[in-house]
Amino acid sequence: MLKDIFRKKRKYATLSSLPPKNSEGGLAYFDEPSPEQESTRKELPDGLWVKCPKCGEALFNKDLVENQRVCLTCSYHFRIPARERLEHLVDPGSFAEWDRELQTTNPLSFPDYEEKLAEAYQKSDVSESVLTGQASIEGMPVVLAFNEGNFMMGSMGSVTGEKITRAIERAIELRCPVIIFSTSGGARMQEGILSLYQMAKTSAALGRLAEEGLLYISVLTDPTFGGVTASYASLGDIHIAEPGALIGFTGPRVIKQTMRKELPEGAQTAEFNQSHGQIDCVVERAEMRKVLGRLLRYHQEGAV
């Protein structure tokens, strides 16, 4: 036929565009999944895998948690809940929590604040955005405070400031060093000026700690911003940060919107802050206990 004469002859091998047929003559790739296969799919729990935002690697969530939430491929430091951090840091069974009964109210009758607090209680296992208490690290007593990022982004309200201040005052009574792990978006807007008071309150308490000659180590984690950066996070005798932690007063997006300027790439990272003298050292999470233990030994009362 004429169409066969003018048809272009292929000089290369080709594959059929149709999938192979199954034993019953149907198209194998278009078969519906069996009930057993469908059941298996539905039984897979949510959150089984986590994608690393830095390297893109798919990580088994259980392995990630066991590795202190540090990527096994590129060492990216994920954010970690306060109690998980605590378990990896202190001597087993040594932590005694303080002031768990303190809870936030709504002193300014801010709209929807109670609902946001209720959500925060459900998302975390702390009563406020900070966990405080006493423990030991490598056998040395220490007073600790951990911001909880899952509780309203670790924001500082009245109860947060009160718990940190009480912890510092007890450290003075006990003659113990203080370590605070900061993770916060800043002062809590729902409490207005009452939240801003906490900057002065915690700073004054740390001033009394310094007058007593007691050590304060500030550990800045991702993210540390706003009123927390402008108060207790920046008042340490020694400042440590985790790798890649974002540290500053205002985020780059807000700076761009208000100042019409863009920050240099990486300008608010822990490494940038260290290179400009704001941070003394950047420490991997897996090494944090060992480094803190060494610093506590160096600064023990009576040590040479």
Curated annotation (Swiss-Prot):
Q: Which cofactor does it need?
A: Zn(2+)
Keyword Nucleotide-binding in record: yes
- Can you name one GO molecular function term for this protein? acetyl-CoA carboxylase activity
UniProt cross-references to Pfam families, sorted A to Z: Carboxyl_trans, Zn_ribbon_ACC
Quickly give the catalysed reaction.
Answer: N(6)-carboxybiotinyl-L-lysyl-[protein] + acetyl-CoA = N(6)-biotinyl-L-lysyl-[protein] + malonyl-CoA
- Subcellular localization, per the record? Cytoplasm
Pathway assigned to this chain's UniProt record: Lipid metabolism; malonyl-CoA biosynthesis; malonyl-CoA from acetyl-CoA: step 1/1
Per the entry, the cofactor note is:
Binds 1 zinc ion per subunit.
UniProt binding sites for Zn(2+): 52, 55, 71, 74
Q: Name one GO cellular component term.
A: acetyl-CoA carboxylase complex
- Any idea which UniProt keywords this protein has? ATP-binding, Cytoplasm, Fatty acid biosynthesis, Fatty acid metabolism, Lipid biosynthesis, Lipid metabolism, Metal-binding, Nucleotide-binding, Transferase, Zinc, Zinc-finger
| Function, in words | Component of the acetyl coenzyme A carboxylase (ACC) complex. Biotin carboxylase (BC) catalyzes the carboxylation of biotin on its carrier protein (BCCP) and then the CO(2) group is transferred by the transcarboxylase to acetyl-CoA to form malonyl-CoA.
Q: Identify its protein family.
A: Belongs to the AccD/PCCB family.
What name does the UniProt record give this protein? Acetyl-coenzyme A carboxylase carboxyl transferase subunit beta
Source taxonomy? Bacteria, Bacillati, Bacillota, Clostridia, Eubacteriales
